[in-house]
Amino acid sequence: MSRFGRAVIVAGAMMLAGATSEPRVVIVLDDPRAQLFRPDEAWGLAIDGAQRGEVDQLLTPANLAAIQRSGLRPLTYRLRTELGIEAWHWNPAGTWSDAARAQGYWTSNDTLGLPIQLSWGYKLPRRGDTVDNANDTDFSRLTDGDRTTFWKSNPYLDASFLKDGQAHPQWLIVKLDQPRAIDAARIDWAEPYATAFEVQYWTGADEDDDGGRWQAFPHGTITSGSGGRPLLRLAEAPVKTQFLRVLMTAGSHTMMPGAAGDDWRDRAGFAVNEVGFGTVRADGSLADVVHHAASHTAQTWTHVSSTDPWHRAVDRDADLEQPGIDRVFDSKLGNGLPVMMPTGMLFDTPENAAAELRYIAARGFPVKQIELGEEPDGQYGDPADYAALYVAFARRLKGIVPGAVFGGPSLQQGDSDTWMLPNAPGSWNGQFIAALKRQGALRELGFMSFEYYPIEDLCGDIHTKLLRQSRTLGEIADRFAAEGVPRSIPWIITEYGFSAYAGRAESELPSGLLAAEINVRWIALGGSAAYMFGIAPAEPDNQHAACAGYGALSLYRSDSAGQAAEPMPSLAAAQLLTRALTVPGHDLHWMLPGRVEGQGKTAPGGTLKSWAVARPDGKLGVLLLNRSATQSVTLPILVQARGGTAMVANGPGEIWTYGAAQYQWRSAGPESRPSRSVPPAHALLPAGPVRVTLPPDGMVVVVIRR
């Protein structure tokens, strides 16, 4: 007898592997690869920041009831402000470091008052990035043509704060419109300025050239800088390049004009008003090839290593709102379970983060996991800088919420790579883990988190891309292990979806297949949890290319008022997992890998996938996916003990089926919508051998005694 109980078989109807050419599913009941999980911890939902007015539109009683019908119970709160280079005023009430002028470094109020319903991000006026990963409406102050504005690096990366014994040089990168001849630079320094810095050019053919290196110009190394606005003659002969970098290693620690009081943060880091590059004219002036404009579409592109979280009351971004903390917990979206909460980090202060956690603790909200920042790899900063901030924040915040652990880094993608950092080449996450180890701080990483949107191109053969992503999740797990992520901590997909872009495939049957597979495969690989992104009912959109059509990543297609209307395949996938495959609730289940044999010509390319769940009620749940767009498949389910003989499973039982008979998407541009949308079909299986028919693009769950 296996640890999961005795399999029910059909006496005399034994089917040996290889005895027939038809496909068949084989479940090994005591497979050593089985993974323990609890449904109310493993499969959840993600709520994020939104555009103006969308939080109110989402959190209505009708929408909340519709979302909870998914059966996905735990919740993670996503922090869009971290993608938009904004500081999060998690409580609109709070204090400024320069209160008289309503500016400086913000700390939200941690005293209890009226419930917080909405919160906002605040743009950072000392920004040095031309683009961001959120609304992307702001611009870099390095090439905006205004000498009264400036970029400043994050003072919390200064040695005066970190005291970690590590060098954290800061940098700015300029990407010209095309390769240009460069022999001079004008760096218009603000306060504090760099006393030691190096002006460099990129030797690679392009930014993705693995052989590229940052090379100092012949006269580009400055060891006794004194600020000002000097014209630097970098070389006797111009160097042709498209990418330039100013690497700053020592600062003046001088106070900027107009600073209030004697705040150490005003002395820490580096500040630059404007940069220009080009060649020296005969009259000694600079023929500047940089485009200076206060617009992210018109200025020369720049990117920086970090940003000062200093801002003003007038910088509130009314178009980027976050759900209020109280509102999230009061909504019951988390079903009373612990919610994974974030704090700002890359663009925030530890003081504000600490106040947030004190507020959560005072309210008694259930929180066990706290994610520090979001998508730092997508900001293309130095992973060693992120690691230093991570450790500093984690140690500062530890113990405020009793029993809570800190984690991250919420990678933009599992296969994160560094960008133009030849001193730290390869895996961004690998460099992050290595930096934690150098500090003796790997124990501060309480869980590993990343986001997963595997289909980048929504045009072409979607089904081939589905097959490819099956391998991708396994490759990510292998990569984490190779990077040194401890297996003793939870590995969590804190957001997943079909694609980061909206298009037709997100609303067609393959979207349900992918959602189901991500959830079960991640658990089967030893992952701890996966959270679905896209809980807000949505209207179809196209964010990719004309060939991608219109669709939405959502549980429901919305009506014109943003309320849940027609169910989408992602809802069916969630319900099949939470209400059919498993027993709802907190009881322990075992995830078993299923083996599909004999696919051959009947199912070319491995289009059939299967997993099984040993349930606490003594039953066996089996999930089958058919990722063929055209072929239906009928096959038996076999069970065996390890080393034993595979035998055909026997009914009675239950079966749920979801395919084209239940759902079809009608493409009509922005007016696209389901032409058919009904729940998965449910039927009872009679006694006798279990044979299952999978429709094209179909999901099937079978539950039998084991």
Predicted regions, residues:
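Disordered, acidic Ser/Thr/Pro-rich linker "stalks" and the adjacent N-terminal cap
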Residues: 89-178, 190-193, 278-287, 295
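Extended extracellular/luminal ectodomain segments enriched in beta-structured repeat modules
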Residues: 167-169, 177-184, 240-242, 617-619, ...
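Trp- and acidic/polar-enriched beta-sheet ligand-binding modules for extracellular glycan
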Residues: 168, 191-282
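Aromatic/acidic polysaccharide-binding cleft in carbohydrate-active enzymes
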Residues: 493, 497-608, 616
